[in-house]
Amino acid sequence: NCTFDTGDDCIAIKSGRNADGRKWNIPSENIIVRNCKMKNGHGGVVIGSEISGGYRNLFVENCQMDSPNLDRVIRIKTSTCRGGIIENVFVRDITVGQCREAVLRINLQYENRENCNRNFPPVVRNVHLKNVTCEKSRLGVLIIGLDDDQHVYNISVEDSHFNNVAKGTNDIKGAKDVTLKNLYINGKLVKE
């Protein structure tokens, strides 16, 4: 029952940056976000980018998000500098008035200009959204994986309606096993 109006990530989940995070290797885990309101920010609920220790088991439900200054609803950001395994993200019953960019954004190429050792490919798996409505955004789902499709997989959006999507579509690259079941964008059923 909290309201977030931060101008940055409304809720930011982290587990350490680069070598420090890998040294400790303790994932953030078992977080429930329920009955919250998110307004201005880079993302409503965000995992990363300092997520080198990993993350598992996020439950987000019954939340409202709405602002022309809210960039994304659910955001996962990491890179080959950070690494980490991010898994088991469950989101349901979310009402969004508007967001600037995308309802779901997964980005494995965050801050690609950072000078670092890039031998730590991250994995994002088991991310599931159900019963999410959004009345305005630029895209529905935006996934920026790596050059292959082995690091982002088992992603689903189900029983959801995204209206007034400016680009009228999703933009998914570098991912496999993406399921869109009963997802409507601008009133049209999205074919898998």
Model-assigned labels for residue ranges:
Residues N1-E192:
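Extracellular/periplasmic carbohydrate-active domains that bind, remodel
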